[in-house]
Design a protein with these regions (language model features):
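C-terminal target-recognition/interaction regions appended to catalytic cores
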Residues: 1-162
């Protein structure tokens, strides 16, 4: 998959297009977790970041970064498809992650169809969502606790006394 890819049969198999400058930035970012801190060409650094390049705190160091293959993914936000909004660069390809990749990281089933017509709307749905698997596990734990409390003869509700 390349930057700017669009699958007409499934909008989720879409990646954001990149400007020539952002393509250069990403090409110079190491695979598997690289950041813009390694860029030797400071003309590619945004002015706001230049003065902080060698600072220990390295302000906003995740922006234009690549994801890692073997580490937890960053928080999937509503703008995860955009390279300039966090560590959303693909670990080994010169592009940001696709909508489907973001949805998969959020634990949406691969066959899930998002009812939206734009990249922005779909990414907002994905980024604002409670991950479905997390919701399932919380619901299961609440149900099990309710059943257990009922079996023990507790008459009150699950949250009584809190």
């Amino acid at each position: 998959m390349t930057e700017g890819y669009k699958d007409d049969s499934d909008l989720c198999h879409t990646t954001a297009g990149l400007s020539e400058t952002n393509l250069k930035r990403l090409a110079l970012t190491e695979f598997d977790g690289g950041t813009r801190k390694g860029w030797q060409d400071t003309d590619l650094q945004l002015p706001v970041y230049k003065k902080n390049r060698d600072n220990e705190k390295f302000r906003f160091g995740e922006i234009y970064g690549r994801m890692f293959w073997d580490k937890p993914a960053p928080t999937i936000t509503t703008r995860f498809y955009s390279l300039s909004n966090g560590r959303f660069g693909h670990p080994a390809q010169n592009r940001a992650i696709s909508l489907r990749e973001g949805a998969t990281l959020q634990t949406f089933p691969l066959e899930y169809v998002f009812k939206a017509d734009t990249i922005s709307d779909i990414s907002r749905i994905i980024g604002n969502a409670v991950p479905p698997e997390l919701a399932r596990r919380i619901g299961k734990a609440v149900l099990e606790a309710t059943i257990e409390n009922k079996a023990k003869g507790f008459a009150g509700g699950l949250f009584d006394g809190l």
